[in-house]
Amino acid sequence: MLRFAVIGHKAVSTPDFSLNDMPGGAGRMDVLCRCINASFFLSHDLRRDTECFLILKGGEQADPANTVTLRFSGEKIKSLNPDERSAGALIKKALVTIPEEEYQRAAPGISIRKSGLAKLLEEHPFAVLDENGEDIRTAETLPENFILSDHQNFTEEEMELIKDLPKYSVGPRVLHADHTIIIILNEFDRRGEQA
């Protein structure tokens, strides 16, 4: 199972946002929607052995207590179409569910809980995508779990949490998070490994 975790630094954690204003009013939710689509879509199919976690920090002036994690499972997801609005609608629907400490089913293939990066790191051995990391094209083996940031850099607090994790790079230039996910999946495909 391949896993991608994307931190949405300004992403709202409530369903009261407009699908017509995901870049602004939803805190760059459009970036996260593209990451969902990149994680799962093939031509005429979905990657069933992939999960994507969105860590929604709650908006501009967010209280850390309002951070939620959404888990999307390729094995069970339904009603996902290859456009941002479709992914945004699923996120909005999932956020209607009141998050608790453990994952709750919010929709087919989507779960929600009240937690952030620290708890996710306790559960899975993640690697960090960083332009100064080991190149995925030359790495002997690749991890199955990757952490990315949205359009912003990791915060100091996040850097402290991930400082000892292995770091990998998709190349010498900084790319959009969704493009990075596609390149990683392509590398797994080229190696004939899962995903």
Swiss-Prot record:
S-adenosyl-L-methionine binds at residue 129. Its EC number is 2.1.1.257. It comes from the Archaea. Keywords: Cytoplasm, Methyltransferase, S-adenosyl-L-methionine, Transferase, tRNA processing. It is an enzyme of class 2 (transferase). Pfam families: Methyltrn_RNA_2. Transmembrane segments: none annotated. It catalyses: pseudouridine(54) in tRNA + S-adenosyl-L-methionine = N(1)-methylpseudouridine(54) in tRNA + S-adenosyl-L-homocysteine + H(+). Gene3D superfamilies: 3.40.1280.10. GO terms for biological process: tRNA methylation. It is found in: Cytoplasm. Belongs to the methyltransferase superfamily. TrmY family. Homodimer. This is tRNA (pseudouridine(54)-N(1))-methyltransferase.
